[in-house]
């Protein structure tokens, strides 16, 4: 199990583009991105035969489940909103401009495809949470629980500031080894201990419900690759 950074500060801005109908090709993405300020990293995730192995984790109470995700990372507010939405429109996606934190750094340091799966969770906050409460609870209190109770090897939080379509509050990106795709015990980082597994599930569920509305959150697994 990966270890969490001692403090998960907001360390970047991310433009998250979600695709619901079709996913653009890599060359199309690169051509469109050439017109933007150069990002520090670009990741593309999409549903395919590989990620389908983790279909048991899919949740779609909202009826809107993304089939692809593009993430561009910037060290500062280098991208204005009008440019961001135009970029997403060109690719046929929805733009979400976010403050980003990385409790567990992304394991792909070069242009490779991750051997496991990316779990993408798009959510609206629990009713009654203010902006500051959402930010504090999610980044400072929930993040350690999410790391302690799951076998995630990458964990990135995206607090949504602006959305071109869906009114999302947060986008979670977690990377899991392929062994966790169809195994409760491998997913919840407990080996073969059923009692510990149930404890992890209970802790994670209770902590998650402090942050998000489970009936307004979707979960899908994708195959992740780094383009830049």
Model-derived features: positions:
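Macromolecular interaction modules
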Residues: 2-228
